Amino acid sequence: MKRKKLWMLAAILTCGLELTACSISDNATKADTEAGTKADLTVLTEWQAGKTVSDKIVAAYGGLDKCFAAEPIPDGVWARMQGKTYKENPYIGRDDLRHIRALHWDYDNQIHVGEMICNKQIADRVVRILRQLFDAKYPIQRMLLPDVYGADDETQMRDNNSSCFCFRAIAGSTKLSKHARGLAVDINTLYNPYYKDRADGTRFIQPATAAEYCDRTKSFPYKIDHDDLCLKLFTEAGFEWGGDWKSCKDFQHFELIGE
């Protein structure tokens, strides 16, 4: 009888130790998960454009509605723009512009954090369009401020970056671009290039690496054409598409009509 009692006591103690170990392990796993979630959340709380996030992190942040907004330009972003996309000028200032936060999908079905600077006149429209594109899982490869590329348009286009504001002239001209006022948006720029056929038979292309994408009869990722959702949404919102221009073609480009 004593042996039986001792055996039962040993079994109870062993079970208790195992339960305690399981509890400690579960608590450690929970702590690790919470720490990981907190670390991942900083991608959104600090709005780290270019980083990827999961549906779970978006939900923990507060949901999709919180991830699409147009706000006054934060001090840190404004500092990054100085001497790059923004130069002192008499035409447009900080109060005329807005910082857009948005999420976007890529072709690999990953969610990316994006940002864009645009004129306050079109900010709400652009946010609405970007949300509709996200809801439709429309692929946009990158949405970074051109300042990341030193405000060099050729460089950012080669990287297929999508953007809006940059205080600069039209290529090959001294006339200010609609981008200089934040009234034009370029989407998936490598695959939707600008080109102009010259009188001498040569063709000027931007980005220079996009010659193969000037042939719009071909099928390739990120292509904008007349059946494209991005084109539909921008034109419905009062923008014109550079792909319809006669003297040149700018397939990436949407600018506000009449401004």
What residue ranges belong to the model's regions?
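Bacterial N-terminal signal peptides that target proteins for export
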Residues: 1-9
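N-terminal module-boundary/linker segments of secreted carbohydrate-active enzymes
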Residues: 32, 36-110
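Active-site-adjacent loop/helix surface patches within enzyme catalytic domains
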Residues: 139-183, 189-194
